[in-house]
Structure formats: C-alpha cells, structure tokens
Regions:
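Catalytic-loop motifs flanking and including active-site residues across diverse enzymes
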Residues: 61
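Conserved short "hinge" loops at termini or chain/domain junctions
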Residues: 1-58, 72-275
C-alpha cells in the first residue's frame, strides 16, 4: 500500500510538509497490527485475495489502524514525560470530536466486513481453508445476521457471541434430528452455486430457526441453552420439508431413519383385550 492509497481512505488529512514523516510511516505499527487482525480472523494465511476483495481489505485495515492510532498521534515522549505536539495555530480537536472520529472509523470497519466475508464465502478455494471452515460452521449468513442483530459491541464480538449459541443449537440438531452427513451437506448450500433448490431451501429454513433461537437466548440469558423442547418446535418444519425431497430424504434416512422412526404400539399381554 502506498501513502497516496492510504490517504484516499482517510479524508481531511493535511498533507505532510517537506521533511515530515509520511503518514503511512507514522501509522506503520497500527497498520501491521490491523493487517494481522484481518488475516487471523477473516482472510487466513497464504490466501491471495482478488482485486475487489483486496480493496475492501485495505480500507478495513486503514480504518482500524487509524482508529487505534488517533489517541497517540499528537503525543510525544519528552524527558519530562508525555507532551502534546504543537498545533501551530490550529485549534486542537475536542475530546468529543476525537471520540466521534474514532467511532466513525470503527463503524466503517464494521460496515465493510460483511461484504468482504460474502466475497470470501462465495470463493470455493477460500471455503476449503481452515478459516473458511470456521465461517461455514453455522447457518448464519456471513456477518449480515450479526449486523442486523441488536448489539452494543463491535461486529466480530457480536458474531462470536451469536456463533456460540448457534453451535449449541446445531449440536442438538445434528445428534437428534439431522445427522452428521446431512448437516455437512446443507451447511455450505447457502454459498455453493451447485447446491440444489431443495438444499438451499432447507439451508434457509434452518438459518431462520437458528436466528430465532439466538434472538430468544440473547434477550433471556437465564433461559436454558440448549432448550430441547424449543429446538424440537423449531426443527419440526425442517423435518417435514425433508420428506418432500427424495434425494435429501435418502441421505437423512440412511443415518437418522431408525432413530426417529416411531414403532406402533403393540400389546404383548395375553388377555381378553389382547390385539
């Protein structure tokens, strides 16, 4: 990234005078930290993003780095302790203005993460990576569902909290109702262009059930999680829908058919009412 590129992501920054350190050099430690954060949580090591994705990634890195750096940019360490750099006739920004700037930069990070994740999720090569498998670990739609969820924290923290509840829901869903094979088959259907309409429909149904579960348990932290009675009511329509797709039903019955098959009652006691 060049200094000019960096400046294009941060409006209203005064240009350096001759001999002054470039802005990109001032931000270097924070840029490296932000890049490591983005790589570790989203892109993964060794993956070369396409140009569209790379532009989003650069914007996120710059905004996150600048938000982290802002409180320190006008401070210098002197022999007598920390001092504020002279503004040379410019009025120093108030604490409130700086806080609004930092909040705006963090908002920009959160606004650009969802489209970046969707670009990644629609890339088969990235989906096969370990970080890709992490983001395919639930039926939530990338970061979009976390973005719409009521929250008071940053987007990634909100997503992780929702993901924990989603995994509890999915554990019961897999072990008691769907089985491992069908779960794996359906979880990628939201992003796989080769998924059948039936697979995409079931993925969407499970996604909505999962979000209802998360919404309830987010608002009532004392509620039992997982609540098996609640899960059954959420998953019952999914089980019924499976019956309409012969191909999916075959996969499901091969693993779960015997577990969910209800044997008719038979009286084994000999007597006048024996049948």
């Amino acid at each position: 990234m060049t200094n000019a590129e960096l400046r294009s992501f941060i409006p209203n920054v005064i240009h350096e005078v001759d001999g002054e350190e470039l802005l990109i050099d001032k931000l270097r430690p924070w840029l490296e930290s932000a890049a490591a954060w983005l790589t570790g949580n989203f892109i993964g090591e060794g993956y070369a993003p396409a140009p569209t994705l790379e532009a989003l990634a650069k914007k996120i890195i710059v905004c996150k780095a600048f938000a982290e750096a802002v409180p320190s940019l006008d401070l210098t360490l002197s022999p007598a302790g920390f001092a504020v750099i002279s503004t040379e006739g410019r009025a120093p920004a108030s604490k409130e203005r700086i806080e609004r700037l930092v909040a705006s930069l963090h908002s920009s990070v959160d606004a650009n993460l969802p489209p970046m994740i969707l670009l990644l999720l629609h890339n088969a090569e990235w989906r096969s990576t370990s970080i890709g498998q992490y983001w395919l670990g639930t039926f939530m739609f990338g970061l979009d569902d976390a973005q719409l969820h009521k929250r008071d924290k940053d987007l990634l923290t909100t997503y992780r909290s929702m993901r924990d509840m989603a995994l509890r829901f999915q554990t019961e869903l897999e072990h008691k109702y769907l089985g491992r094979r069908l779960m794996i088959q359906l979880m990628a259907a939201g992003y796989d262009p080769e998924a059948t309409p039936d697979e995409q429909n079931l993925w969407q149904m499970i996604r909505h059930a999962e979000l209802r579960y998360i919404t309830f348990h987010s608002s009532d932290r004392k509620a039992q999680c997982p609540d098996l009675h609640e899960i059954w009511h959420l998953v019952a329509p999914v089980i019924r829908e499976i019956g309409y797709s012969p191909a999916i039903r075959e996969v499901w019955e091969s693993e779960m058919g015997d577990k969910l098959r209800v044997e008719p009652f038979k009286n084994t006691v000999q007597g006048g009412f024996f049948f």
